[in-house]
């Protein structure tokens, strides 16, 4: 009987929920650090390997995803989605801005292996802008080797637009390459429970259990900022659009879209749920059939919050001063990063190095920040996806209702 059950148990562990596996790895890492400090330090190699794999795959991931997305864009879509697209972009930027304010009000720090002496922080907005411009003109091979994500992004956008004029075979090849890289990322992330087990064990063994409080505070800041956006910022944007009480619509979207997204942890997987909710709300089919998939790709308020909060936590840890113009620029960069986070589990975490580049933070340190993100990702990723996906249907409904009101008022005047 035991021999029959064991393969089933192993299969469930290997192919089960990644969230549950990460939670198990987190708990086991804490227990090992509490029971045996030497053993916990030894298994730190697992965490090092996991971070190394992430660092290896992240640059090519950004290049292929952005290039394939632009190259395969379909022309001639006759739908009125401009107001919705504007809400998507405004909502994402507002979320990043709220995250900056929240991070300044409740500053967090991380436990990293490098100090401020290892980097050359920019002195202000002028130096930041100069660094951004110089990063844009980097050699593409050099950008990939050194993890210069801004340079990678520029080359990906340029190649994507150039490939729009290519034949379908070329576009299909780029798309297949993007899918292949995405598969590799998913494969790496399947090892997240083992990597997190090693990271948590070695971190607690070397820094003590007080590290947990630092992560707990960071998680409170992240989730608190997401709640602020969901219950304050988004309702304000919806009220501005429909000019009436936004909370019935906001709460409906959170209940019937956000709850599902919280457990699926995938905006793409939640598209059918959002489509059904749009149909229930009697929205224009030609509009939401385009805006919902589009939102699952570019409407990333939760990702913008994650990128901003974790980047500023790294900045605070390294003692880098941040002035107001630089903080505003970070909001813009985080918004752009968030729009490239779709389609990949943990995508927002893998784009944190791009924002960290603004402050002269090396790729090695930035990937340590990504690893911290994976440790708290059990709850962070679920909350992020719930905010992202529920906002897709919320802004679609707001824009459609505003258009219906406009048409009704025009009919009354006539």
From Swiss-Prot:
Molecular function as annotated in GO: L-serine transmembrane transporter activity; L-threonine transmembrane transporter activity; neutral L-amino acid transmembrane transporter activity; neutral L-amino acid:sodium symporter activity
Membrane topology recorded in Swiss-Prot or TrEMBL: Multi-pass membrane protein
Regulation affecting activity: Activated by valinomycin and inhibited by monensin.
Transport as UniProt keyword: yes
Reactions accelerated catalytically: L-serine(in) + Na(+)(in) = L-serine(out) + Na(+)(out); L-threonine(in) + Na(+)(in) = L-threonine(out) + Na(+)(out)
GO cellular component terms listed in the entry, alphabetical order: plasma membrane
Job of this protein: Involved in the import of serine and threonine into the cell, with the concomitant import of sodium (symport system).
Protein name per the record: Serine/threonine transporter SstT
Gene: sstT
């Amino acid at each position: 009987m035991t021999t029959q059950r064991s393969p089933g148990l192993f299969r469930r562990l290997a192919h089960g929920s990644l969230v549950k596996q990460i939670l198990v790895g987190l708990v086991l890492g804490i227990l090992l650090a509490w029971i045996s400090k030497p053993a916990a330090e030894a298994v730190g190699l697992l965490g090092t390997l996991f971070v190394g794999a992430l660092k290896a795959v992240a640059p090519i991931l950004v290049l292929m995803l952005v290039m394939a997305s632009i190259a395969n864009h379909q022309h001639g879509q006759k739908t009125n989605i401009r107001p919705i697209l504007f809400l998507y972009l405004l909502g994402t930027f507002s979320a990043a801005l709220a995250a900056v304010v929240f991070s300044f009000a409740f500053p967090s720090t991380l436990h990293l292996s490098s100090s401020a002496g290892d980097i050359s922080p920019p002195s202000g907005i002028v130096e930041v802008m100069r660094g951004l411009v110089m990063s844009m003109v980097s050699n593409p091979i050099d950008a990939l080797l050194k993890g210069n994500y801004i340079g990678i992004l520029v080359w990906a956008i340029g190649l994507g637009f150039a490939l729009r004029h290519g034949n379908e075979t070329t576009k299909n090849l780029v798309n297949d390459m993007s899918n292949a890289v995405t598969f590799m990322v998913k494969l790496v992330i399947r090892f997240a429970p083992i990597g997190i087990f090693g990271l948590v064990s070695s971190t607690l063994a070397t820094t003590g259990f007080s590290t947990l409080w630092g992560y707990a505070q960071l998680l409170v800041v992240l989730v608190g900022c997401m709640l602020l956006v969901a219950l304050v910022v988004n309702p304000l944007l919806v009220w501005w659009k429909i000019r009436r009480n936004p909370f019935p619509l906001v709460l409906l979207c959170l209940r019937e879209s956000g709850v599902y997204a919280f457990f699926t942890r995938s905006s793409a997987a939640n598209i059918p749920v959002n489509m059904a909710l749009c149909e229930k709300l009697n929205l224009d089919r030609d509009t939401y059939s385009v805006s919902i998939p589009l939102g699952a790709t570019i409407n990333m308020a939760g990702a913008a919050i994650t990128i901003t909060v974790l980047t500023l936590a790294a900045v605070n840890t390294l003692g880098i001063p941040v002035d107001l113009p630089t903080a505003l620029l970070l909001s813009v960069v985080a918004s752009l990063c968030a729009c490239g986070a779709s389609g990949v589990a943990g995508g927002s975490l893998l784009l944190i190095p791009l924002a960290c580049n603004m402050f002269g933070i090396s790729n090695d340190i930035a990937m340590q920040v990504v690893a911290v993100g994976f440790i708290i990702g059990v709850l962070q990723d679920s909350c992020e996806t719930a905010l992202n996906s529920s906002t897709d249907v919320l802004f679609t409904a707001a824009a459609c209702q505003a258009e219906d009101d406009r048409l009704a008022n025009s009919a009354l005047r006539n």
